[in-house]
Structure formats: structure tokens, C-alpha cells
Amino acid sequence: MLTFSPITESNAALFSQYYGICDYRLSDYSIGIKLMWNDMLASEYAIYAGCLIVRNKVRGRYAFDYPIPVTPDADIDAAFSAMADFCSENFIAFEFSGIPKKYAGEILLRFPNTETRRYRNLGDYLYLASDFADFKGKKYSGQRNHVRKFYAKYPDAIFRAFDEKDTDKLKAFREKVEAAFDKHSYGAKNEMERAWRMLKFVGSPMFRCAGFELNGEIISFCLSEKCGDTLIDHIEKALPEYEGIYPAMVQSFAQMFAWDVTYINREDDAGDSGLRTSKTQYHPVQIEEKYHFRIKNELYYIEKIPLIKTDRLLLNAIEETDIPAYNRLCLDDERNRWWGYDYRQDCAEPDEEYFYADQKKDFGSSTAMNFAVRLDEEMIGEVIL
């Protein structure tokens, strides 16, 4: 059975190595995303059959990433089986999130009874690194013009790598960016705050950090991470008063750091129309779709617990009026020891509605269906499917 442990700053270097060899080309498969959004994703991992298995919280429920082979003898089939067994044994929904399009078929082949969704707002923008380094051709004429204007207006601007010695300058840069920030949506503010959390990693070998400096002050900042053949740009920030600074930063960063990759991933647009326009204008070679899968079982198609009658007994849904009888049943240690489950493992001191609410949750997630067994309309037992 899988045993999961949290992904944290203390073990981040290990996952930087794993994601460094991952060829999925999605930002979801990077230590930067796991750290920036850790309080929301609550990412956990297990190593099984030579594969890195990661699960994250998505809309309040855990969903798996696509497994990553990390040893030469990795067995992805065994990893999938272990994930399925883990969900079955723990009565939780079996879901995947952030699955690359090229592996969507693998999920469907293994689990044909599947609900599939994808979200345009979450698609990552993928560009050729060589396009950004050169800005060649008619399609990049606008970017070239902005870059020329930037250097003509600010000839003393220097693009350079940042390290831990730049902490104070980056703090001053942060204050200026926040003072000029004019977006009021929760999503934009949330992304900004999470971006600043990554400043502590400037100088870390896990990331590539650089930006423009002018007259001793930092005026732009970019933080990226190499994952396989792709450079994933986690953060791009600049002071807006410097005309042309964004295309100049994009090009300079590619020239400095994209020498060993084929692609640059600038992540999603989160549905922001301004970001969508901007990222589209840089001519992505692909918008990498991400798929969410929920593996269905027979219970998925049952909307209501059915009524079953025998000559003597009646089986139907457990009702709120059954709570006293149901609690007596669930708290009967002498009987319950025979089926190997101790509720104290999940809740040491359950309140009056704990067991009733728990079985409703299991049915709602299609993991179990609990029947009350009734004799003369009185609940005398339980059957679980």
C-alpha cells in the first residue's frame, strides 16, 4: 500500500532532481509550482515501482499527477494499480488532475469508465526557446521594436543573474511593483503574493533567476526552472514605467538560460483576458492542455440508494432518524472487531452525527453504499457495498 509524505521546502531539492528529468512540459510537474501553491495543493508523494507518485488537493479532493518514472526499471502499470488500490482501501474517489494531453489516452485505456474534463484557462503556453532568443521574422516585429525602444531609452540597463546577495534590492523591487499594481481580482492578488514567496529561493540551484538592473536598482525579475527539455517560467515581474521591458526581459532571459532546452513554458493565463492577449502575441507553438479524470465505478451511476425487500427484512438508506441506532452499531467494539476496522483511527471522539455524515459522504463520492438492515422497520444492522 502507498504511504504518502508531504512535499516541503526541506525536501524540495530531491523533487527538483525528479522534475528535472520529467519530459511532460507542464508547469504542474515542477517543484516551483508545488512550493508556490503548497498551502492549497498540500502536495504529497510516494515512491513506488520506480515511479514518483504525487497527489494534490484539487477543489478540496485529492487527485493524482501522472506518475513519473525515476529509475531505469520503473513500472508505470504497477504504479497505476497501486494508486487504484490506495483509493479503494481508503474509500476515496480515484481522480487525476493536470494530465498532459499526450498521456490522456493512457488513462482512458487503463480506465475506460472515466469522466473527463479539461479547462482552457489552465492550459500552459509553450514556446520555442529559439524564437524567444532571436525574435526573428515578421511575427515578432512588434517585440523587436519594443526591445529596440527599451535599449535606446535605457542604454545603461544591464541584464544579469541574481543570487542571495541581491536580497535587499529584490525587496525594494517588490515594494515598487506592489505600489504600481492595479489589479483588484483575488486571483491576481493571490498570484502576486505567492510569487514573492519564491524570493527566498533566489540563488538556489533549483531555479534560474535574473532580471534588469538600472542605476543600481532592480527593475525586472524572472524565476524559472528547467524540467526536461523545457524551461518553466514561474515568475515574470517588471516595473511598468519602463517601456519595452517585458519583451526585452523575455529575450534576454532566453539568451542567458535557454541554451539547454527546446521549449519555454510561460504557464497558463488563468482566464485573464489581458494575460491571454499578451501570451498569444508571443506566438506559442502549442497551448498544452491539461486533463482531469475521475475514474467511475458502478456506484457512480446510482443516484439514490435503492429499496430492497425480502420476506422478513428491508434494506434501504440510513436516515437521520436512525442516528441513535446507527451509533450503537458503530460504537459496538465487541462486534466491530470481527471486521477489522477501528473508527478511532480516523476520529478518536466522534460526535453524534459523525457516522451518519461519514456514510453519506462515502455515497456522495461513489466509494461505498451503506444500507440499513431493518426488521419491522427498526434498524438492526448494516450492509456496505
For each predicted feature, which ranges?
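Conserved active-site alpha-helix within GNAT-family acetyltransferase domains
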Residues: 103-116, 145, 270-287
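Acyltransferase donor/substrate-recognition loop-hinge adjacent to the catalytic core
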Residues: 111-183
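GNAT-family acyltransferases
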Residues: 164-176, 180, 298-385
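Short, conserved active-site entrance elements at the starts or edges of catalytic domains
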Residues: 165, 169-217
